[in-house]
Amino acid sequence: MADEPWKATADGVVVDVRLTPRGGRDAIEGIQRRADGCAVLKARVRVAPSDGEANSALCRLIADALDIAPRQVTVAAGATSRLKRIRVTGDPAMLVRALRRLAEKG
């Protein structure tokens, strides 16, 4: 589906995320449509964006939500931006199903 902010790859998925640091809680809040029409997975973390802490918290949040090891989740692009591209390694079909369930709950 083109309206989803993730794309399956040979060894996992790539997810476009809009992160709100210092968001008051750690949560994934579903899919948001940006002004340019692109879909992003909206997430927030409690920590401030200093020394990569918000990126680490985001990776842990996604790993916990998908029930996978944190080492499977990395920031592929946008390390210093609110808009990030997250790489998740694993079975692509399983990850896409889990992301769809996660987005519906958000």
Region locations from a protein language model:
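Contiguous, often N-terminal, cationic amphipathic patches that form binding interfaces
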Residues: 1-51, 55-59, 64, 70, ...
